[in-house]
């Protein structure tokens, strides 16, 4: 029973982290003039629209996973570089804001069930934000970098984007994943500690 309830709480935490992250991308793109995500029904906080089943299981088992990427057309932005950067960072920003809200809930609400769920939401939002800031396509960290490098290099990188899964697997197996992600997680926690 404990294991089942623990898994359910994890799923809630993951669903919230993924939903706010992808909504952040979709809504920021909408504000900047691109309604591609809205047309595909992705400008929503409904987890069913964003969750990838395999990515969900991967997050529960390996603590690293993925969601269905929100479709964005940067060519609809008035300024490609600025728009692409803002949209790339919007998901991570949404994760951090959500974590802050949950910290404040735990600070002022004393109810075990709510506190437990909020704690998982915090952990997964921090983890999802840090993971997405890695400068590897198709993650948000690369989205920011790609806005400022010549198009021909972008094309070259995206040509080999399918190899990203191999890179992630290698990072996990070798333990290098923690080496790269831990500093990002530490920075995010320093921000969150300001609200504790």
Q: Language-model segments: what does each one mean?
A:
Residues 1-196:
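Hydrophobic transmembrane alpha-helices and their immediate loop junctions
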């Amino acid at each position: 029973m404990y294991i089942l309830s623990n898994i359910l709480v994890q799923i809630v935490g993951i669903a919230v982290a993924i939903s706010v992250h992808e909504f952040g991308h979709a809504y920021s793109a909408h504000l900047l003039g691109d309604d591609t995500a809205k047309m595909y029904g992705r400008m929503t906080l409904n987890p069913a629209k964003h969750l990838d089943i395999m990515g969900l299981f991967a997050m529960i088992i390996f603590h690293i996973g993925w969601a269905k990427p929100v479709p964005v057309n940067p060519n609809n932005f008035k300024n490609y570089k600025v728009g692409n950067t803002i949209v790339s960072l919007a998901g991570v920003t949404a994760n951090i804001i959500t974590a802050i809200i949950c910290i404040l809930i735990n600070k002022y609400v004393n109810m075990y069930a709510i506190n437990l769920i909020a704690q998982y939401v915090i952990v997964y939002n921090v983890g999802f934000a840090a993971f997405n800031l890695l400068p590897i396509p198709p993650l948000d960290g690369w989205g920011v970098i790609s806005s400022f490098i010549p198009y021909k290099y972008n094309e070259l990188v995206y040509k080999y984007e399918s190899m990203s899964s191999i890179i992630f697997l290698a990072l996990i197996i070798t333990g290098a994943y923690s080496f790269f992600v831990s500093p990002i997680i530490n920075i995010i926690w320093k921000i969150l500690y300001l609200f504790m």
